[in-house]
Amino acid sequence: MAYATPQRFIQEYGLDETTQLLADEQQLLTSQLLSDALAGSWTGTPSAAEQAAANAAKDRITRKLATVSNFMDGYLRGAVTLPLSTSDANAGTLEECCIALAREGVSDDSDNATERMVQIADRWRAWLKDVQSGRVSLITVAGEEVASRGRVRTGQAASNFNWGSFPPRSY
């Protein structure tokens, strides 16, 4: 399940920026063609090449959102039981994370990527690591923690007792 849709990506960053990010590989792509491809109907009579470019861009953003969602699940799986409810209190946060990481992913050229995009994506990756480690908890709409995976911690607890002060045992 993808945490975000192409329509939400466009709502967040605008049709023009989305087209610019995706047009890098599709020189025929325009904002109108991308909008039409997402809507599933064509305005006017675009050529077969223009339709193919728009459909390829639509497929690229859809695929990027799906792969980013799978990437996020890799972190979340260690902390919570998946899939999460779409009506969950975390849905907006996870959607925003997915969109920001996908934006960095489609900004794969130096003429598209900015330092700010990378910083935002790094912040979201750090947040995912915090969720995975348990430093950040996801909550339900009711304000309770999302069902966890039942982590078990093992190892020796730290002790301030000076065990070295005991004389060695003689057998």
Model-derived segments and spans:
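Conserved short "hinge" loops at termini or chain/domain junctions
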Residues: 1-91, 151-171
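Exposed alpha-helical structural elements
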Residues: 8, 67, 93, 116-119, ...
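Short loop/turn elements at secondary-structure junctions
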Residues: 27, 100-171
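Secondary-structure capping and boundary motifs in well-ordered enzyme cores
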Residues: 90-98
